[in-house]
Amino acid sequence: MVKTQIKEKKKDEKVTIPLPGKIKTVLAFLVVLAFAAYGFYIRHLTAGKYFSDPDTFYHFEIYKLVLKEGLPRYYPMADAPFGSLIGEPLGLYILPAIFYKIISIFGYNELEAFLLWPPFVGFLSVIGVYLLGRKVLNEWAGMWGAIILSVLTANFSRTFSGNARGDGPFMMLFTFSAVLMLYYLTEENKNKKIIWGTLFVLLAGISTAAWNGSPFGLMVLLGFASFQTIILFIFGKINELREFIKEYYPAYLGILAISYLLTIPGIGKIGGFVRFAFEVFLGLVFLAIVMLYGGKYLNYSDKKHRFAVVAVIVIAGFAGAYIYVGPKLFTLMGGAYQSTQVYETVQELAKTDWGDVKVYYGVEKPNGIVFFLGLVGAMIVTARYLYKLFKDGRRPHEELFAITFYVMSIYLLWTAARFLFLASYAIALMSGVFAGYVLETVEKMKESIPIKAALGGVIAIMLLLIPLTHGPLLAQSAKSMRTTEIETSGWEDALKWLRENTPEYSTATSWWDYGYWIESSLLGQRRASADGGHARDRDHILALFLARDGNISEVDFESWELNYFLVYLNDWAKFNAISYLGGAITRREYNGDESGRGAVTTLLPLPRYGEKYVNLYAKVIVDVSNSSVKVTVGDRECDPLMVTFTPSGKTIKGTGTCSDGNAFPYVLHLTPTIGVLAYYKVATANFIKLAFGVPASTIPGFSDKLFSNFEPVYESGNVIVYRFTPFGIYKIEENINGTWKQVYNLTPGKHELKLYISAFGRDIENATLYIYAINNEKIIEKIKIAEISHMDYLNEYPIAVNVTLPNATSYRFVLVQKGPIGVLLDAPKVNGEIRSPTNILREGESGEIELKVGVDKDYTADLYLRATFIYLVRKSGKDNEDYDAAFEPQMDVFFITKIGENIQLKEGENTVKVRAELPEGVISSYKDELQRKYGDKLIIRGIRVEPVFIAEKEYLMLEVSASAPHH
């Protein structure tokens, strides 16, 4: 009785932390706050005029839409002229919007708050790792894990100002939810347990709305539940298993419920994965039921039999899941590292190699020190877990969760470079565990306090070398990122020119990397045909145009309603990827085989210095003297296949070999200011013409034709803006005294002219050709000079006309033909339901379509449903994975059906409603036809069903100045 009273008394007594322990906790937390603030400072050093990360320009625009509209569904600037439904979870933007609403009280504007948001996420992440570390091991583990995270390059890479992607907020929220989960599972006070559990479920559920990669969090939590369930059962801890199931399973179900509910308004976007996770969870529930109640029928007498039961059920479950889901079962988060030709060329989606790990987890230099510290820490946690399991008989939640978190993070780290950041939390945590374990060991030593203090001090100083040496280097790097490529290369001026000198509904494109810059309200504020997250099927078509020459490179850009094409000279550095995606080179030539052999350099610029053209990085020197050209590559002398001189047009043929007998399959183009060494397969690429002004082509006259369709209108730094027209005139000849002579201007009076037309990627059909007489920018007369019933864009011919011209300052040649007009301003609706503008109807579906369209002037238009197929045809290699495979991009565009006619569109915004039906089989039959034609050589990249307005449209072909009459 006395013993019982004593026990009850002890039970009622509050456990207090000794004063030194409290001091250590307070001091550790203050240190963590200091380093979190230091980490925030470093991460905010990158804040400048623009964002360092191109994708963040897009995220900024959606963030502004959230502030304006609440829950926007549509982004009008992408995939011109159609726009795009927002595919990212709105939670990614709601979080910084809430942050802005709070700090705007202190005078911060939208942009300033957005620049502060990623460093703030980094600040909170440091605190989160501290709390998680102290829960997993001890105060030291949390503190040192936080210190390491504050200056870790891997974590900095996604939490610096100007990089506002979703993985940062997600990992921050997930880390805090993990802390709450561990407190929930280990708390004995019922009321506190309810509070911890509620917060855990809410925060874990909300975290899934921050990033489309948030299934990682659900899988970590599910993996932890699975391992704990199985291990407790195998070790015969049935009572503990019952308690764990009672506590954890309802919580996980609540997380799934919140995650799914957030997908309904678009705040989250992982509904499909939530359903999959629920199905897997049901499998785990079934396994748990068998464990708890199967003892009546199965042999649970020892660990071997219990393990056998689990093994059989798990194997059967995987087999069933594979039958149900298919091969995708083993591609967790596979969307982040899909194996397509485009993704092969995106650096962050490439497979992680050891060099990446050394850089992102290095201290002072690429050495991977933090990665190794984390590995040792993981071993310590594993050893502690096994000890507790076998010796103490406890159910160690903290260690098992940490191991699960670490293992799954490392797994993803090696799948794609983009996950180097994601793994930083687990690796920093385990690095802190290593430090915490060492310091805890010192504390428990039976030595005198001075000796322990000295040892602890030495260890602390050694650990402090990580932030003390790496922090300043990271800060220096951050400062250099403040000024972006936009400001130093000509992009800023070019895009501002575009915004200030083109109509509001104009569209523009470049290589896809720069699409978000074109769209940004900070820069171009114009619709882009392709960018880093939309219209990825078009990437191949852009590459085809840039990397190829002649008829095959003629793309129907008019179907995109393209107005301006921006060429960036520095894209020579990306030209291997462009050439590969455009079908000019093979996979081996692009990036080498598994041993790196066979890779080529497709383009190499050689700036001119005196009489030499030099690229010191590549050790290439070109000496030009009179009619001879000497090319030195390292210690070899090489003779290109051909040398061309611009503007003289002179050429010198060579052997294509080097002095050591190796092949040198390159063509050298020399201009007055720069030389270009080009791999023979891309030696006449359109990019070389447009970027460097080299009129090289395998097709006589093609360069002249190209420049009639692409007219340079602005240049700044390394960026050239071209105005695109699908129909141009590249040469005018006049019959002067019985002889046809090329003329460059016209005079008032009678003329007999021959017009050489370039139709780029699109036929001329039922068109009328006019000359507009212009006087002081005003049209004073329109003169009809010809009608063209049909002209194939692959087989143009000159048009002979007779015309009498009035007095004017210039004469404008204009082709009037039906073509696509207008841009969508809002998401289209079918029967009141929002639809993708590029997949507006399904086969056999009908309904009322509602469109909001903007036009730059009044039109009478017809409305069509149009199909666009973008696909690749393998033209070499045994299969699609062959290193010798090359893929020819194709784009087929055809009208399906007219769904509206004589629609009156007024300048500005218009709302149009029509009844429409997509005939059954029209898409599938064309797809089947392609598959029959190309077999296993076919890869379909995109199938679109688009609403397109067609109206009489004026195409400016050429404008020439007027001169005095001939004498």
From Swiss-Prot:
InterPro entries: Oligo_trans_STT3 (IPR003674), OST_IS (IPR041530), OST_P1 (IPR048858), OST_P2 (IPR041152), STT3_N (IPR048307)
Cofactor(s) this protein requires: Mn(2+); Mg(2+)
UniProt subcellular location: Cell membrane
Organism expressing this protein natively: Pyrococcus furiosus (strain ATCC 43587 / DSM 3638 / JCM 8422 / Vc1)
Protein name: Dolichyl-phosphooligosaccharide-protein glycotransferase 1
Motif TIXE motif per UniProt: ranges: 345-348
Motif WWDYG motif: positions: 511-515
Catalysed reaction equations from the record: an archaeal dolichyl phosphooligosaccharide + [protein]-L-asparagine = an archaeal dolichyl phosphate + a glycoprotein with the oligosaccharide chain attached by N-beta-D-glycosyl linkage to a protein L-asparagine
UniProt-annotated stretches for the region Interacts with target acceptor peptide in protein substrate: 511-513
Segments carrying motif DK motif: 571-578
An individual GO BP term: protein glycosylation
Pathway: Protein modification; protein glycosylation
Annotated a glycophospholipid binding sites: 418, 516
Motif window: DXD motif 1: 53-55
Positions with a binding annotation for Mn(2+): 55, 165, 167
Enzyme Commission code(s) on record: 2.4.99.21
UniProt comment concerning the protein's domains: Despite low primary sequence conservation between eukaryotic catalytic subunits and bacterial and archaeal single subunit OSTs (ssOST), structural comparison revealed several common motifs at spatially equivalent positions, like the DXD motif 1 on the external loop 1 and the DXD motif 2 on the external loop 2 involved in binding of the metal ion cofactor and the carboxamide group of the acceptor asparagine, the conserved Glu residue of the TIXE/SVSE motif on the external loop 5 involved in catalysis, as well as the WWDYG and the DK/MI motifs in the globular domain that define the binding pocket for the +2 Ser/Thr of the acceptor sequon.
Gene: aglB1
Extracellular-facing ranges: 43-112, 157-165, 215, 269, 328-360, 418, 475-967
Top EC class for this record: transferase
Protein family according to the UniProt entry: Belongs to the STT3 family.
Membrane topology: Multi-pass membrane protein
Residue ranges that the UniProt entry lists as topological domain Cytoplasmic: 1-21, 134-135, 187-193, 237-247, 291-306, 382-396, 440-453
Transmembrane segments: 22-42, 113-133, 136-156, 166-186, 194-214, 216-236, 248-268, 270-290, 307-327, 361-381, 397-417, 419-439, 454-474
Upper taxonomic lineage: Archaea, Methanobacteriati, Methanobacteriota, Thermococci, Thermococcales
GO cellular component: plasma membrane
